[in-house]
Amino acid sequence: MTRHQIESTVRTEYNKYKGTNAKKTRLSIGIGCGTASYEFDLYELNVVIGCISTSSWFNETGTNNTGGQDRASSELSWLSLWQGNESRVHILTDKEMAHRLFKKHSGALFPHSIEIHHFEINTKRFSLIGTL
């Protein structure tokens, strides 16, 4: 499966799991000219906003996938910048990434709670890792 196919599968399964109708949506963050925008993988007005990360913690050679780790961490920043009332969720398809990302950011003071979930693509099951 491609990254886009995996994201689509995760979104479909999340909507079934939570009874939502979240879609991939580009949203403006801020006001005025020069307003930043970001494409969130999950969004349903007044319900949920979220990101899906498909990167693994380690790359194929067994070394740290720093690019993937940085991208997964930056998703937390975008979720923190969002000013809406939606619940925030970050879903990761790599179990190692989900656990290590949660551990890395545990204890940090986020302005809004963000749930970290692992999604097992083979069994289509979600596991809550924790809430930041």
Located regions from the model:
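Flexible, charged surface loops at secondary-structure boundaries
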Residues: T35, L42-L45, L81-N85
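Acidic-and-aromatic substrate-binding clefts and catalytic sites of carbohydrate-active enzymes
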Residues: G30-T35, K95-H99
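Active-site beta-strand-loop-beta-strand hairpin of nuclease catalytic cores
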Residues: Y38-S55
